[in-house]
């Protein structure tokens, strides 16, 4: 259970310990404050039960949140718990949701990119603001033009060696980056500028069949040649290495004896279209 919490919150063991201590001390402190205030206002066994219940409920709803932030500050976890509180307030409708602005990075035809754009169109707080292609004259640039989305063609050397594209992303207010068939390695300066805010989809079950040069039909051919009984998709956070970030979602399919690299590619493509947009929707709100 603790391992699952650590993975869900993406924190170190030490930070997880401090977070759990914060929750525990907050619960104990809230109970103490509730009893103290109840005694201070003079509530006892003869008090109408509803008044006592409403007072304690108010302390639980409002006092708990304040105490939680105070204890979190003491333990050096204020940022984590303030984000936690904001999520609760957004779900309650007290705070508006952050406006999510996506940049999609792609290298080819752009079918995944178009699928994401169509899905995102129905969500008022999320928008695709920018398409970045690693190649000129690609299908994804035509898609950008069709949907009226600004598009840029990367210069690989400048992408690897300068902060130019980070400045472009920031000037557009981009909050998250989605890789959709993007074949270049993401440079360290970009992952540092968008920590845990870059997502990728890989056409295999990582950690198998990942790494430099493993993309498209090369992956499916390797799966067929290995005689694997199953394959699938992996959606993961992006770090400084190829196909190495934290796994967010995986979906498996059976590889039939009659499958070829081409037929397997078609199956995997259907999985990508079915799951990638909905996973992105959850990912941007985590």
What is each model feature region?
Residues 1-9:
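Short, Lys/Arg-rich, polar N-terminal cytosolic tail immediately upstream
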Residues 7, 38-52, 91-94:
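Membrane interface segments of multi-pass transport proteins and intramembrane proteases
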Residues 15-19, 49-57, 176:
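Residue-level signature of transmembrane alpha-helical entry/exit and packing/kink sites
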Residues 16, 20-28, 32, 57-65, ...:
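Alpha-helical transmembrane spans of integral membrane proteins, capturing the lipid-embedded, hydrophobic core
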Residues 30-42, 67-75:
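Membrane-water interface at transmembrane helix exits
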Residues 70-89:
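Juxtamembrane/interfacial segments flanking transmembrane helices
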Residues 86-98:
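Membrane-cytosol interface motif
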Residues 96-286:
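One-carbon transfer enzymes
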